Structure formats: structure tokens, C-alpha cells
Amino acid sequence: MMKNKTIYILGTPYTIYFDSPEEKMPDGAGGCMDQSLHVIRIAQFEADKNTIQDMESYKKKVLRHEIIHAFLYESGLWNNSGNVQAWAQSEEITDWIAIQSPKLFQVFKEADCL
């Protein structure tokens, strides 16, 4: 079971809440990042015959996804991403990944989501 914790995204503390109840989550979301509160929430998941069985692995994937959102916000790219045409060819996102990846990996390690 993953425990709530605080991590630092480019110097800003973000609190991660695991097993957040449905009423605290956007409809249908497995995770969410609230940049106004510096909070990342991961939903309560229960395995059943129609879902992924390894919920811990899935929670880690969702957490990595939300951490990336937080990095993009804290990097100033949150509102500058209106053009999605050929995004994989963008030098901007390629440079961003190259520059931020060591920091991302460190936070992933601290959040225990690798």
C-alpha cells in the first residue's frame, strides 16, 4: 500500500494523496493534479474481473502521469501548449524532456513510483 507523502517539483512541495475517495476526484479520473493547491490525488482502485489486477503497478503509472503534469505546470509550459500539431516533432518538448529528465527520475524515485 502506498502512503501519502510530500514531494518537491522544481522546488514546490506537492502532497500526494493515495486512495482518494470518488467525491474528491474528477469524474472517471484515476488521478488528478491540482496546481492551485499543489496536490496530486490518486483514486481508490479495486481490482475486479474487468480491471487490471496489479493495482499497485497501475497506481505508480498514474502517479508518474500526474507528476509529469506538475512538472509541466511548474516549468511554465502549462498554458503554452495550445498547438498540438506534430507535438512529437517539437524541439521544445524534446529539450524539455532532455533537461528535466534527471529531475523527473529523482522525483519518481522519491515518490516510489518506478
Please provide the spans of the model-predicted regions:
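Active-site recognition of the HExxH zinc-binding catalytic motif
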Residues: K61-Y73
